[in-house]
Amino acid sequence: MIDFSRIQKELQDCERNQDSSGIRVCPKSDNLTRLTGTIPGPIGTPYEGGTFQIDITMPDGYPFEPPKMQFSTKVWHPNISSQSGAICLDILKDQWSPALTLKTALVSIQALLSAPEPKDPQDAVVAEQYMKNYQVFVSTARYWTETFAKKSSLEEKVKRLVEMGFGDAQVRSAIESSGGDENLALEKLCSA
């Protein structure tokens, strides 16, 4: 059974330290089983200046089972699926320990952005590009960061969609649920 008191304590710890690390965790629901993590892109990487959101689902066995985490912000990285946001990181699988926390998992994901492991990829296409044409990889990763993870670009997307006649809250929700993809958000808004 989920230890909700531990999750609450971890959320409080993250809130206390968010200014220094930039890492945040917020509940998506009242029952604390769905959370959103936010990490800043590491300095000196193609992800610098970006803010990346991670969907977190707490399993019934937490803290003895790892939280399920995946990027909702699109990211170009060998160990992260460019399609689904799935993350290839050992501590989110067989190397999880109850001594680890949500914050340590998010710090580890942030470190993964700094140090890709292309020989153990989640996304083979990105890993191949990383190994065969590193400069193109860096350019693509920067472009994705600019397009999907920069706040200014988010505000520009919101503005464009609001100008089409959709409500601000509705637009922000559609963009978030689309991982920052403006075209997919527009499709969702039009089909709603």
Swiss-Prot record:
One Pfam family matching this protein: UBA
UniProt note on tissues of expression: Expressed in seeds, pistils, siliques, hypocotyls and leaves.
Domain UBC core: 2-150
Entry's Gene Ontology BP terms: protein ubiquitination
Origin superkingdom: Eukaryota
Broad EC category: transferase
Keyword Ubl conjugation: no
This protein's pathway: Protein modification; protein ubiquitination
Any one GO molecular function term: ATP binding
Record's keyword terms, sorted: ATP-binding, Nucleotide-binding, Transferase, Ubl conjugation pathway
Active-site residues per Swiss-Prot or TrEMBL entry: 88 (glycyl thioester intermediate)
Entry annotated with the keyword Nucleotide-binding: yes
Enzyme nomenclature, EC number: 2.3.2.23
Domain UBA, residue spans: 153-192
Xref: InterPro entries: UBA, UBA-like_sf, UBC27_UBA, UBQ-conjugat_E2_core, UBQ-conjugating_AS, UBQ-conjugating_enzyme/RWD
Reaction equation(s) it catalyzes: S-ubiquitinyl-[E1 ubiquitin-activating enzyme]-L-cysteine + [E2 ubiquitin-conjugating enzyme]-L-cysteine = [E1 ubiquitin-activating enzyme]-L-cysteine + S-ubiquitinyl-[E2 ubiquitin-conjugating enzyme]-L-cysteine
Induction field: Up-regulated by syringolin, a cell death-inducing chemical.
SMART domains assigned: UBA (SM00165), UBCc (SM00212)
Role: Accepts the ubiquitin from the E1 complex and catalyzes its covalent attachment to other proteins.
Family named by the database record: Belongs to the ubiquitin-conjugating enzyme family.
PANTHER family tied to this protein: UBIQUITIN-CONJUGATING ENZYME E2
The protein's name: Ubiquitin-conjugating enzyme E2 27
Designated gene of the protein: UBC27
